[in-house]
């Protein structure tokens, strides 16, 4: 017996004894019940994809138009954040190179000037042991010497020559002093040259470690790390 015949037999048996006027109504209810019992259960309904909850697990083909737009928005935002991160990383790298690691940076010139001061016999005689000579920038509320900024300026004159000028404080076991530095990179040259580097110590004569007039008499100097010595 096929399913249709079986359904008819069942219906005729179920409606036996029911008034004729009620049979059409009961038949429709009975059919709906039978259809519901025979239906295949659906799987759990998935959550709608938005730019804030999309994890990429739902395949692209199963997304609606709105969900595809949401995923595209999320991916565009993520790509933009990656670009911003790369730009910030490049900016930090450029800053570190120009201000710290480059041979022409202020930090490099400051460190070389301090090394020259510590190794000069006249400075050692006036200020004391070279190993105990320290240099730092302007006084601040910070007790750490290394955190005190060194006053400096970089300019380019009308002829295209680059100038670096700075002053900082030098402390030794015997005395304290103030150092001043002026360096020039002439247009068309690749190295900075000292115009002057001197230290003023109270009750002592100014000590010149570099002076353009005196250095020019000594002929051409050796160039290393972007500075002529």
Curated annotation (Swiss-Prot):
Classify the source by domain of life: Eukaryota
The answer to keyword Repeat applying to this record is no
Its record classes its membrane topology as: Single-pass membrane protein
Topology feature Mitochondrial matrix, residues:
32-76
Q: What is its main location?
A: mitochondrion
The transmembrane residues are 77-97
Q: Which biological processes are named by the entry's GO terms?
A: protein import into mitochondrial matrix
What subcellular compartments does it reside in? Mitochondrion inner membrane
What keywords sit in the KW lines? Membrane, Mitochondrion, Mitochondrion inner membrane, Protein transport, Transit peptide, Translocation, Transmembrane, Transmembrane helix, Transport
What are the annotated GO cellular component locations?
Answer: TIM23 mitochondrial import inner membrane translocase complex
| Mitochondrial intermembrane membrane side | 98-229
Transit peptide residues according to the UniProt entry: 1-31
Q: Which family does it belong to?
A: Belongs to the TIM21 family.
SUBUNIT field: Component of the TIM23 complex, at least composed of TIM23, TIM17, TIM50 and TIM21.
Question: What is this protein's function?
Answer: Essential component of the TIM23 complex, a complex that mediates the translocation of transit peptide-containing proteins across the mitochondrial inner membrane. Required to keep the TOM and the TIM23 complexes in close contact. At some point, it is released from the TOM23 complex to allow protein translocation into the mitochondrial matrix.
Protein name, UniProt field: Mitochondrial import inner membrane translocase subunit TIM21
Task: Write down the species.
Answer: Gibberella zeae (strain ATCC MYA-4620 / CBS 123657 / FGSC 9075 / NRRL 31084 / PH-1) (Wheat head blight fungus)
The root-end lineage is: Eukaryota, Fungi, Dikarya, Ascomycota, Pezizomycotina
């Amino acid at each position: 017996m096929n399913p249709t015949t079986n359904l008819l037999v069942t219906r005729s048996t179920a409606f036996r004894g029911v008034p004729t006027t009620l049979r059409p109504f009961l038949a429709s209810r009975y059919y709906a019940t039978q259809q519901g019992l025979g239906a295949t259960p659906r799987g759990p309904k998935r959550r709608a994809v938005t730019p804030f909850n999309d994890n990429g697990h739902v395949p692209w083909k199963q997304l609606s138009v709105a969900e595809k737009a949401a995923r595209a928005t999320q991916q565009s935002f993520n790509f933009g954040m990656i670009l911003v991160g790369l730009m910030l990383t490049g900016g930090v790298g450029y800053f570190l190179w120009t201000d710290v690691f480059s041979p022409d940076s202020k930090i490099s010139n400051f460190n070389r000037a301090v090394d020259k001061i510590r190794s000069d016999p006249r400075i050692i005689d006036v200020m004391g042991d070279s190993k105990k000579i320290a240099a730092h920038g302007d006084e601040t509320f910070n007790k750490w010497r290394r955190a005190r900024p060194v006053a400096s300026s970089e300019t380019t004159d009308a002829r295209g020559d680059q100038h670096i000028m700075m002053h900082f404080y030098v402390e030794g076991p015997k005395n304290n002093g103030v150092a001043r530095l002026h360096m020039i990179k002439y247009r068309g040259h690749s190295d900075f040259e000292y115009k002057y580097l001197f230290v003023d110590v109270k009750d002592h004569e100014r000590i010149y470690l570099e002076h353009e007039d005196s250095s020019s008499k000594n002929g051409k100097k050796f160039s290393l790390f972007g500075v002529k010595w």
